[in-house]
Design a protein with these regions (language model features):
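Bacterial N-terminal signal peptides that target proteins for export
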Residues: 2-10, 230
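Hydrophobic alpha-helix-in-membranes signature
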Residues: 7, 209-211
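Bacterial N-terminal signal peptides
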Residues: 10-18
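Sec/Tat signal peptide C-region and signal peptidase I cleavage site
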Residues: 19-26
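Mature extracellular "passenger" or substrate-interacting domains of secreted, surface-exposed proteins
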Residues: 26-208
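A short, hydrophobic C-terminal helix/tail in secreted or cell-surface proteins
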Residues: 211-228
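C-terminal membrane-anchoring or membrane-association module
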Residues: 225-239
Length: 239
């Protein structure tokens, strides 16, 4: 049975109340459940080497075929990482963050680039990784909310109005609201990537990152396999 999520969220609320004093507005609470099901490609629990970041890609669309371009187009809103127990706590398997947008559209997070301006309505992604470099052993999960509607305890993952004059304006971007996998898996669905295990239940699973160029080869191989299987089934069905 899972431990209630109230404690981490109360901690986030306390941080938010402190941060929203002054010129900041449009606070976002984001993260996972306490004692969540977070795994790597082998089915092992994610360890303290992982980080969890929320951000946008501007006008760039991330796909499995252009993984080598993600880092160059990534704009960080906030990051949760170890050893901050209220960021990424690998022992209790939860990550949590609270971040406010400034009226000019920049993020108040110390992990964000102060030059990055986030346009209202921009799609927000969650990127989990043990390294943003594509090297042997790198594992990623990149997921987002495809429905863009309130549900599963989460608000739509889109940048709110940073100039909202209400100091109590807030949004909740929780992992439970993720429904699209660019790489890795979320909420029981494995997306693109290489895995050696499939957990019975998972909220997030990272996948091995393909080396540049290999993603197209993998997709081509998969397409060829499906074509051969289709031809074989067609021959078997003929009298």
């Amino acid at each position: 049975m899972k431990t209630p999520t109230f404690l981490p969220r109360l901690l986030c609320l306390a941080l938010a109340l402190a941060w929203t004093q002054g010129s900041q507005a449009s606070t976002v609470f984001w993260g996972s459940q306490f004692n969540d099901n977070l795994f790597n490609s082998t089915g092992a629990a994610l360890d303290s080497t992982y980080s969890f970041a929320i951000g946008t890609f501007g006008g760039f669309t991330p796909t499995y075929q252009n993984v080598d371009q993600w880092a160059a187009n990534w704009h960080v809103i906030d990051i949760a990482f170890a050893p901050d127990v209220n960021g990424w706590n690998s022992t209790d398997q939860f990550f949590a963050g609270t971040v406010a947008f400034n009226p000019d559209g920049t993020s108040a997070s110390p992990d964000a680039n102060p030059a990055d301006v986030f346009a209202q309505g921009s799609l927000v992604y969650l990127w989990a990784y043990n390294s943003q470099d594509i090297v042997p052993g790198s594992e990623w999960a990149l997921v987002r909310d495809a429905s863009l509607t309130t549900g599963n305890g989460s608000d739509p993952w889109i940048v709110p109005d940073p100039a909202n004059p209400d100091p109590n304006a807030s949004s909740n971007w929780y992992l439970s609201g993720a429904s699209t996998e660019i790489i890795g898996g979320t909420n029981g669905v494995q997306g693109a990537g290489t895995y050696t295990a499939t957990p019975g239940v998972f909220s997030l699973q990272t996948a091995v990152v393909p080396e540049p160029g290999s993603a197209m080869l993998l997709l081509a191989a998969a397409a060829a396999h499906l074509a051969r299987r289709s031809r074989r089934l067609t021959r078997m069905s003929q009298p």
